[in-house]
């Protein structure tokens, strides 16, 4: 875990100073095509404007890129209430959040619209004959419901579910289109309900160029939850950070630890990768294994593992804006966002990217 001298009141002040108003037309509704033709702002002592496909020119052969290889699941499902004596059958929107292994087998947390009380039965899919039965068995503090299925629902989600998209994306295209577009090219382990979007800029061709120049690759898994979109409302100290599951294999933990010991740069692809690395860091090495993290990185927190961070442009008032301010410094982030606003960068999940250097001294 990272060292922290973070003062919540200071974080409140930083968040207020970093506030910005964003015109709606600057929110990217589709990604660049090809993916690596998005813009890349390089933020260090100076700000430079490049294209994402220029990344090989900005990295060193000794660098280690660390990716989050979690895969977005089709977690948005339409369900119906059972028909009893000719009544019922109403539609319920279900957003599956994650499997709650500590509660029991085949239990998921989910947001329901409209919400249902414990004891209610739902059928996910077309109808009761072909659908999948779930019972509401509990209510969580944030309003999510616990659903217990009769069987493992995961193998059926590709058939009955749709990909969940951020609330600021107007999904005009087909679900099949989004299943390709809102997924990194290296996604592997299913479990996220939001994409680790910094990785959306990579193409197989760009990865091959990085391999050819000797940049090493490692990966971690952090299943991104819907809480990633939750804004900070009120004092930072009162914000309840969402829990997310992560895993680092023995091989990848060893590769990252070795890079740190050899003084090579670790380049985190995305804030989810930063949160995983900092959660698994014990002060001397990255620990292999699986766990759950609620890590909240705010100004005053010393980020230990990554030296560079590839990330998109985040929402005002968000935990991610505080994370990048902790990583690169408030002044640099303020200058970077001012530049992004004045130079027509595209924001949020499908927008342009930044390459941030870690601030090593105050």
From Swiss-Prot:
It is an enzyme of class 2 (transferase). Pfam families: Queuosine_synth (PF02547). GO terms for cellular component: cytoplasm. The keyword GTP-binding does not apply. The keyword S-adenosyl-L-methionine applies. It is found in: Cytoplasm. Its EC number is 2.4.99.17. Keywords: Cytoplasm, Queuosine biosynthesis, S-adenosyl-L-methionine, Transferase. GO terms for molecular function: S-adenosylmethionine:tRNA ribosyltransferase-isomerase activity. It catalyses: 7-aminomethyl-7-carbaguanosine(34) in tRNA + S-adenosyl-L-methionine = epoxyqueuosine(34) in tRNA + adenine + L-methionine + 2 H(+). SUPFAM superfamilies: QueA-like. GO terms for biological process: queuosine biosynthetic process; tRNA wobble guanine modification. InterPro entries: QueA, QueA_dom1, QueA_dom2, QueA_sf. Pathway: tRNA modification; tRNA-queuosine biosynthesis. Belongs to the QueA family. HAMAP family: QueA. Transfers and isomerizes the ribose moiety from AdoMet to the 7-aminomethyl group of 7-deazaguanine (preQ1-tRNA) to give epoxyqueuosine (oQ-tRNA). Monomer. This is S-adenosylmethionine:tRNA ribosyltransferase-isomerase.
């Amino acid at each position: 875990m990272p060292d922290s001298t973070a003062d919540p009141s200071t974080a409140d002040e930083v968040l207020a100073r970093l506030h910005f108003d964003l015109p709606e037309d600057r929110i990217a509704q589709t990604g660049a095509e090809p993916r690596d033709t998005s813009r890349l702002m390089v933020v260090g002592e100076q700000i430079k404007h490049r294209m994402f496909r220029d990344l090989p020119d900005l990295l060193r052969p000794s660098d280690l890129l660390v990716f989050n290889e979690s895969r977005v699941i089709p977690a948005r499902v339409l369900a119906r209430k059972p028909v009893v004596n000719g009544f019922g059958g109403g539609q319920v929107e279900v957003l599956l959040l994650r499997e709650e292994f500590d509660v029991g087998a085949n239990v998921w947390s989910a947001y329901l619209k409209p919400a249902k009380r414990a004891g209610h039965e739902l059928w996910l899919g077309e109808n009761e004959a072909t659908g999948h039965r779930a019972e509401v068995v509990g209510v969580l503090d944030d309003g999510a419901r616990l659903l217990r299925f009769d069987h493992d629902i995961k193998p059926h989600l590709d058939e009955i579910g749709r990909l969940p998209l951020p609330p600021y994306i107007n999904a005009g295209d087909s679900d099949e289109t989004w299943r390709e577009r809102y997924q990194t090219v290296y996604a592997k382990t299913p479990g996220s309900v939001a994409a680790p979007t910094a990785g959306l800029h990579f193409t197989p061709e760009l990865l091959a160029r990085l391999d050819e120049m000797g940049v090493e690759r490692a990966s971690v898994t952090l299943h991104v939850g819907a809480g990633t979109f939750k804004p900070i409302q009120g004092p930072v100290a009162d914000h309840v950070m969402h829990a997310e599951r992560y895993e680092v294999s023995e091989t990848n933990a060893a590769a990252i630890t070795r890079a740190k010991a050899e003084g090579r740069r670790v380049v985190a692809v995305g804030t989810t990768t930063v949160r995983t690395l900092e959660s698994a860091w014990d002060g001397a090495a990255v620990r292999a294994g699986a766990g759950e993290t609620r890590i909240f990185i705010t100004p005053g927190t010393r980020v230990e593992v990554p030296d560079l961070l590839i990330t998109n442009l985040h929402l005002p008032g968000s935990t991610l804006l505080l994370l990048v301010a902790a990583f690169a410094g408030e002044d640099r982030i303020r200058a970077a966002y001012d530049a992004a606003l004045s130079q027509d960068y595209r924001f949020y999940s499908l927008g342009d990217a930044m390459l941030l250097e870690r601030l090593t001294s105050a």
